[in-house]
Amino acid sequence: MTSTIDKNGAAESRVFEADVAKLLQMMVHSVYSDKDVFLRELISNAADACERLRYEAISDPALLTDETRPRISITIDAERRQLAVEDNGIGMGRDELVDALGTIARSGTKAFIEQAEAAESGDGVALIGQFGVGFYSAFMVADQVDVVSRRAGAREAWRWSSDGKGTFTVTPVDESEAPARGTRVTLHLTEDATGYTDRLKIEQMIKEQSGHVPVPIALIEKPGAEPAEIADGAALWTRPRGEISASEYADFYRSVAGQFDEPALTVHFRAEGRQEFTALLFVPQTRPFDLFEPDKKRQLKLYVRRVFITEDADLLPRYLRFVRGVVDSADLPLNISREMIQESPILAAIKKSITGRILSELEKLADKDAQAYGKIWEAFGPMFKEGIYDAADRRDTVLGLSRFRTTAGSLRSLKDYVGALKENQTSIYYLAGQDAARLEASPHLEGFRARGVEVLLLSDPVDSFWVTSGPSFEGKPFKSVTQGAADLAAIPRLDAGTEPSPDVSEGVTEFLAFLKTTLSDLVSDVRSSDRLTDSPVCLVAAESGPDRQLEKILLGVGQLAGASKPVLEVNPNHPLVASLAALGQDDREFKEDAARMLLDDARVLDGDRPSDALEFSRRLIRLVERGLRRSSAGGGD
């Protein structure tokens, strides 16, 4: 962003950064059908400004001057084709105007642009609130936006102005032109947006979109007219549940969460006893874009007796960070600092209570409506499973609520899994990796499928970590199918009544011993496999170390000095193994090539590359040529 800066109070002209300019052009030339969203976004910003003033006034009451009651007013000027949204909140100084409205120094801008360009028009408007760029939605209906603001406690007032075409100006304004405190946003409406000067339309929009913000909203039909209160600022969460309709809950959810969907789950309760507080919590239907950003602020707003304190309090564990809403405490002191909040035993007790309540309500939904719960899981399952790793005190509950894709189907619970255990099965088997389709085709599953043993298919990054935390479910430990012995001998095969597999020939037994000796520098062991039925070989990890997927992750982030030697398991009844053993009986060079080819084949089946792709190709050609010569000479089987 470039600028012409005058510290003596003259006009200052600036150029938007490229991403912001592009964003503005998207708004100016918007084809979105639902442009009403702009008013909700401006009212939401105004309400936030009022709440921040109330918080700062706790330590500095002089900021309130003579005007202590927060308010938002919306003025219609049909003659001038203008609409103004004014609040008496915290206000902004010169630098704050530039920082808040001239730049968007956050990753959300670029992500918004990328997704909005790809979205259909109906979906694109929903991205406005989702990505936190709501102020700029004003340019969907205005060809110029003026923002006049005076910060609480300051004499100077400033005007920010832009036509959305790449530049903006910041100029000082006379005190008489500015609010005594707070911000006024004036939209110069485009010709096709004159409908937003209709009183009934604006009144309906306020009631539908913003009727439950905790600040009174008044509508002024024309300049100089008496304000008419449209919303009284009564906090929705203070009302009894029986008096609140589903649509009121949905409107409040969209306001507090910045979402455009319906809540998938609403939890509203009042706690009394050692701690007294009210919580109104929502689980969204769709995943906000920034849930995995490590520096993202938490999304529960903390109030103390209806005074907004912070939206960065540690009110829920990280694995529930998708929950939105408000918590209003009657016990915390109003003058508590944001730093002291995190150390408050009262807050710790509130966190424990609402965490338990959310989990309890999710359990009820899972039992009552598996399909609705399944949609929540599809959206938030990857982060919810972090609780298996992080929340030792609630691990059993989180495990019970978790759903998994398995070899038996999608969204299976562990209760379903344990209920389908096979005879003599003592473990919950899983296979972890990065690609669900590759997991489904893994040779490690063959022996389990042959016995009808269900295997969890884990493809989320967190999966490789929570399974190492030693969890069990209903007394059954989790065991990777790529680690240690499969222990399948005690579980009968589905085709147990058919003719048994032939005994391993002496030649194959000798060939396996040769593999073990030849590959001793590369593998820790070579052994006959009971997990393979269709594939010739596979790699597994030693019993005591990390499984194959976790080792790859740890190597990738530099947490391991080097890879451990895997175990090479060989299917002694596979035709390829038998043929290689027979063809190499009197040819050591052939057997050495065969040994290394089988190891590279196992690496490929495990999702890796051969150790040396060129040598792998040459070795394969040599084996085929020798095999063909021996077969044509009558030396093969």
Swiss-Prot record:
Superkingdom of this entry's organism?
Bacteria
Tell me which UniProt keywords the record has, alphabetically.
ATP-binding, Chaperone, Cytoplasm, Nucleotide-binding, Stress response
A single Gene Ontology CC annotation of this entry is: cytoplasm
Q: Where are the stretches annotated C?
A: 553-637
What PROSITE patterns does UniProt report for this protein, alphabetically? HSP90 (PS00298)
Q: Where does it reside?
A: Cytoplasm
Instruction: Show which residues constitute the signal peptide.
Output: none
Question: What SUPFAM superfamilies does the database record attribute to this sequence?
Answer: ATPase domain of HSP90 chaperone/DNA topoisomerase II/histidine kinase, HSP90 C-terminal domain, Ribosomal protein S5 domain 2-like
Primary subcellular site in the record, as a coarse category: cytoplasm
Which Gene Ontology molecular function entries are recorded, alphabetically?
A: ATP binding; ATP hydrolysis activity; ATP-dependent protein folding chaperone; unfolded protein binding
State the residue spans of region: B: 339-552
Instruction: Fetch the InterPro entries from UniProt.
Output: HATPase_C_sf (IPR036890), Heat_shock_protein_90_CS (IPR019805), HSP90_C (IPR037196), Hsp90_fam (IPR001404), Hsp90_N (IPR020575), Ribosomal_Su5_D2-typ_SF (IPR020568)
CDD domains for this protein: HATPase_Hsp90-like
Name the segments for region: A. 1-338
**Binding partners and assembly:** Homodimer.
Q: What does this protein do?
A: Molecular chaperone. Has ATPase activity.
Q: Which family does it belong to?
A: Belongs to the heat shock protein 90 family.
Q: Which HAMAP family match?
A: HSP90
- Protein name from the UniProt record: Chaperone protein HtpG
